[in-house]
Swiss-Prot record:
Record's keyword terms, sorted: Cell inner membrane, Cell membrane, Membrane, Transmembrane, Transmembrane helix
Keyword Repressor belongs to the record: no
Membrane topology: Multi-pass membrane protein
Topological region Periplasmic: 1-7, 50-58, 166-178, 237-254
Cellular compartment(s): Cell inner membrane
Family the entry assigns: Belongs to the DedA family.
Gene source species: Escherichia coli (strain K12)
One annotated Gene Ontology cellular component of this protein: plasma membrane
PANTHER family given in the database record: INNER MEMBRANE PROTEIN DEDA-RELATED, INNER MEMBRANE PROTEIN YABI
GO biological processes: FtsZ-dependent cytokinesis; response to ionizing radiation
Name assigned to this protein: Inner membrane protein YabI
């Protein structure tokens, strides 16, 4: 899939933007997004943006269009086929996730639609479930548009950072900088994830809860987060940081 996307992009800008629309659309489409490695594909497209092969602003607009198309078709499918969907064996097997999504939409519909756009398992479900619950369009449209405006750059970002790092001129410190950038990103991401696990420690009932008990999270979370912050400070003070920032500015056209 990644090789196919790269082939399209080298052939035409139009093909590249069509690829962005397609990935964003399928990632947002009801249930399809559960099996599509959309996060990886969006990061791959982000790497092409970071390397200058694809316009950031054009890709952002294409991502918004694909996202809105997928969400609104999902909403319509949920509204139109709500009864058959409730009887579908696939949804019966994932009834717990469906029930949680329905409960969240009943309690905090706008917040759930907005935040659900950024959470992998719920992203392709929330619009469909909102349609199944006959949620008024007026309640769906505002958080959905906001989410679709913010989602593409958020998912492009890891790839953009990696693609821009590739363009750093080769030198004695370029390898060191790239490894430091990777380590910083990993520690900050893991630290953020652990913060989320700690916040949900009283509610989480998955397999990881056995290994990441609240007591363990209370010391592991600040440790990993502190390492990430220290790595970020070292990264910011690295001699190649101005070069990297200049590349990123060119990518976004600032």
């Amino acid at each position: 899939m990644q090789a196919l996307l790269e082939h399209f992009i080298t052939q035409s800008t139009v093909y590249s933007l069509m690829a962005v629309v397609l990935v964003a659309f399928l990632e947002s489409l009801a249930l399809v997004g559960l099996i599509l490695p959309g996060t990886v594909l969006m990061a791959g497209l982000g790497a092409l943006i970071g390397s200058g092969e694809l316009s950031f602003w054009h890709a952002w607009l294409a991502g918004i269009i694909g996202c809105l198309m997928g969400d609104w078709i999902s909403f319509w499918l949920g509204w139109r086929f709500k009864k058959p969907l409730h009887r579908w064996s696939f949804l019966k097997k994932n009834k717990a996730l469906l029930d949680k999504t329905e409960h969240a939409l009943h309690q905090h519909s706008m917040f759930t639609i907005l935040v659900g756009r950024f959470v992998g398992p719920t992203r392709p479900l929330v619009p469909m479930v909102a349609g199944m619950l006959d949620l008024p369009v007026a309640k769906f449209i505002t958080p959905n548009i906001i989410g679709c405006l913010l989602w593409p750059p958020f998912y492009f970002l890891p790839g953009i950072l990696a693609g821009a790092a590739i363009d750093i001129p080769a030198g004695m410190q370029s390898g060191e900088f790239k490894w430091l950038l990777l380590a910083t990103a990993v520690f900050l991401w893991v630290g953020g994830w652990l913060c989320w696990r700690l916040w949900r420690s009283g509610k989480a009932t998955d397999r990881l809860s056995h290994y990441l008990s609240r007591g363990r999270l209370l010391w592991l979370t600040p440790l990993i987060s502190a390492i990430g912050v220290v790595a970020l400070v070292v990264l910011i003070r690295h001699p190649l940081m101005p070069v990297y920032i200049d590349i990123l500015r060119k990518v976004v056209g600032v």
